[in-house]
C-alpha cells in the first residue's frame, strides 16, 4: 500500500492503480487516467491536461439523449416505434441502446435554451445549426458513447421518407472523433471480462442486431476504417478478434485494411466472410442466430483467409497464374510462426497444384533465408530505459506547458507529481 503498486502472484501481473484499471476494464492507459480522474472529481482531457472547469459538453448530450428517448414514447413517436418493431427492434433493445427520436414539432434547441445552455454552445457541440434550428429532424436517434460511456454524439436515421440522406451524424468535435470511437465499447467491455473474444463490425445496426439475439461482445467502427487509435483500444480489449464486416467488395477491402493494422498486435485474428453481399444485420435477420454463430465459430484463421484472397482473379488453368499464386502464398507463409500451419500449407500447395513437395519447401527455405539476411542488415532501433523515457516526457511537458517549465526548480518530486 505504501508503494501504491500491486502484484498478482498468480498471473504475474503488476503495476500501479492506472495500469490495474486499464487491464481490468480493458481500456487504454489514457482512458484509465481519465476514468479515475472522473471518480475523484477531476476532469482529465484527452491530452491528460487537468481542468477544474466543469465541461458542459457531457451535460448537454446527456440532457439531449434523455429528451430524444422520451420523445420516442410520446404519441408523436408511434410511427417510429412501428418502424423499429418491423425491424425487430423491441423495447428492451431500445432502452439498452438509448434509442430516441427527433421530432420537427418539438425543438431540442428551445428545450436546451430553456435549460440555460447558450445558443453558441449548442452550435459548437453540433446539435443546432447557425440559424438556430435543430440539426436532427424527424430521425430515429442512436446515441454514440465515448469509451467511458458518456454520450458524445448522435447518429440519426430516416424512417418515414427517402428524399434525404439515410444517416446524419453529429459533426466531429473535441469530444467526438470517429477515429477514436468504437460503437458499443462501453457495453461490450463488460461481456469481455467473461468472453475473451471481440467481434468487430462496420455499423451500429450490425451491433444492435447481434444484441437482439444475445450476442453482446460486438463493437463497430462507425463506418470508417480502423485507425491507430482503434488499434490501441482493441489490443487491450481481448486476445481474440473476429472481423465480421459486410460481405461486399467494400467490406473485403475494410477487412484487409484491418488485418494490416492489427497484425502486429499479437492478438489472434479470425475473419468471417458473409455470403451474398450481406452485412451482419441482414444476415441475422435472414438466417437467424444459430446460423450467424456458426459463421463466427467457423471463421477463417488469418493465413487461410490470406490464401483465399490471393486466389482472386487467378486462372489456375494458366501456368503463370499458378506460379504467381504459389510465390505469393510462400511470401505470406514466411511470416507464420506456427511450424505446423506452415507444413500443412506447404503440403496443400504441393497437392493442389501437383508440384513436388521438395521444390515447394526449397523455395520456402530460400525466402526464409533472404528474410533473415534482410533483418540482420537492419540496425537496431535506439531504446531508452525508464529513466530516459521519464526525462523525455519531462522535456516534452516543459516545452508544452510553461507552468511545468517554471516548476523545474530542483524539486524533482514536485514535477513528477504534476506529470
Predicted region positions:
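Non-catalytic protein-protein interaction segments used by genome-maintenance enzymes to assemble
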Residues: 366-419
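Structured, non-catalytic alpha/beta "coupling" segments that mediate domain-domain communication
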Residues: 23-32, 37, 139-158, 281-286, ...
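Phosphate-handling DNA/RNA-contact segment within nucleic-acid enzymes
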Residues: 103-237, 241, 254-255
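Acidic, metal-coordinating catalytic cores used for nucleic-acid/nucleotide bond scission
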Residues: 205, 226, 245-255, 273, ...
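Non-catalytic accessory segments of DNA primases and related replication-initiation nucleases
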Residues: 1-120, 124
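C-terminal or mid-to-C-terminal helical accessory/interaction module adjacent to the motor/catalytic core
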Residues: 267-355
